[in-house]
């Protein structure tokens, strides 16, 4: 930055309003205008000293550059941010002047002991993956409280996260073998407007499919439920379940104290990686050795360019217990219904369809390759997604009137001799503008065998379909349940679930209460006879002026569901209460590097990776209060099973045992319509 001629008093190419912030300026241009300008002048004198020593400070990152970055790290002025950003880029790209540290001294010293050191230059943030969504930065520092130690959650207080629907990765390098790249984070922080959940799990990922992509037909023994799938060598993380983020006590606190909540931001860190090689020795048996040169591929599909398979209610989400080992699921997707491609050798239509079926290779994307001791992170902003409403009412929209005041509305009726008569409406039975919510109250999901029915509603395509001896209902894709805002004809139609789908465990069947608010599950009837006979509407379609509330959720519910990319849709109202999102968090994919072994055909090293993954979620919450005089119901252990959320003498954990244990929403917080 210093000019070649100190006597020159010109400002050079300084930033407007500054005396020293910019190249080719004088060292004696008057008093600095602010902190950034003063740091720039000090920086110029440092450059001048290096030039006197015969060193070129312009082509090499040097101590004076680092000092400028440090001095301006808290400067929020435009000039301060600009100067800091310029020299951070220089730090990342330019070689260091001999004798200058980039913050990687410890790693450089460790290269004498380890196969690979992690230099500080690796810490430069990479650009986030481009996103199809709007980029809207969100500062969350104002309302985030401190934890018990007085610390704010990891970096949430000092950084902005990516725009809605975008997930960016930044390789942060690491400290090498034997040095931690992050600690264990856990617990939940509650405040008036913000709740922060912090969770860490130990994960393990091994080689999938022998590093191959395969086209497979699954469930071949069951003609009705075969699936044409592409299985891949990749695995992925799935954070889409409330029990992964909230402990039972934290969830009780959330639903008892807050009337509505929604996710706002999420940070995922993958760190403390350990890649190990599995070796079999006749004398020693199986040996697990650290592999310091093997790599783990990782990236986030922030644009959703690959098939999104995080279906609501999937098992293998982040485990509920923090001490559980998370075995990551293998990534596979369904490129087309099997009914339209299974007979492609004899059916011309299916042959043409199969020619157009896509194939996705995840290696077709830029991504990081991390080694033992390294780390990375991804951020996401949920934007203005829907709220989870957590209130109830004992009134219906049709009851919003004063029963003591007469109505001016007239109703007509047929009197004696078919003469039309008119009268004022009864004060207790006056008409309303509002109708109950839509839904289909009937269905056939009551077969004795699961293979005899895929659900109450089934969607399938018939072009080229030839499934011999199998009814369409058994090969279609189910929408279930579908009663919407109406009360179902049968309890068999109700949404039921389990806390886990793990084999060898007791998995009690759970469901949310049928009605804890009078704005759902109505029964719409039509008066069909002069004597007052009525009949139920089995199919109550969407009409103007329908009023209903969203479905309640529980701790075991999924958080979001991805809205398909179509250009026509009706009102989004999920039956299970999950939040519909056009751009949910992108899938974070990982796999082991394929390291060939010479002379053994297509052989490769047998390795696996384990490490920690932490997930911090910022939740926006609201407390509205109520004018209700009477006490309200609260979720309490008094009404729960004695075995709920306990561990037995064999170390087996029991989650929710009965319906009261799931602590559903819409249980309290009375509202006025």
Curated annotation (Swiss-Prot):
GO terms for molecular function: metal ion binding; phospholipase A2 activity; structural molecule activity. GO terms for biological process: clathrin-dependent endocytosis of virus by host cell; lipid catabolic process; microtubule-dependent intracellular transport of viral material towards nucleus; symbiont entry into host cell via permeabilization of host membrane; viral penetration into host nucleus; virion attachment to host cell. One of its GO terms (cellular component) is T=1 icosahedral viral capsid. The keyword Magnesium applies. It catalyses: a 1,2-diacyl-sn-glycero-3-phosphocholine + H2O = a 1-acyl-sn-glycero-3-phosphocholine + a fatty acid + H(+). Residues 118-151 are annotated as: Disordered. A motif (Nuclear localization signal) lies at residues 623-634. Residues 13-68 are annotated as: Phospholipase A2-like. Its EC number is 3.1.1.4. The keyword Electron transport does not apply. Residues 130-144 have a biased composition (Polar residues). Keywords: Capsid protein, Clathrin-mediated endocytosis of virus by host, Cytoplasmic inwards viral transport, Host cytoplasm, Host nucleus, Host-virus interaction, Hydrolase, Lipid degradation, Lipid metabolism, Magnesium, Metal-binding, Microtubular inwards viral transport, T=1 icosahedral capsid protein, Viral attachment to host cell, Viral penetration into host cytoplasm, Viral penetration into host nucleus, Viral penetration via permeabilization of host membrane, Virion, Virus endocytosis by host, Virus entry into host cell. Belongs to the parvoviridae capsid protein family. Capsid proteins self-assembles to form an icosahedral capsid with a T=1 symmetry, about 26 nm in diameter, and consisting of 60 copies of three size variants of the capsid proteins, VP1, and VP3, which differ by the presence of an N-terminal extension in the minor protein VP1. The capsid has a channel at the 5-fold axis and there are densities extending the 5-fold axis into the interior of the capsid. The capsid encapsulates the genomic ssDNA. The N-terminus of Isoform Minor capsid protein VP1, VP1u, contains a phospholipase A2-like region. VP1u may play a role in the disruption of host tight junctions in the airway tract. This is Minor capsid protein VP1. The lineage of its organism: Viruses, Monodnaviria, Shotokuvirae, Cossaviricota, Quintoviricetes.
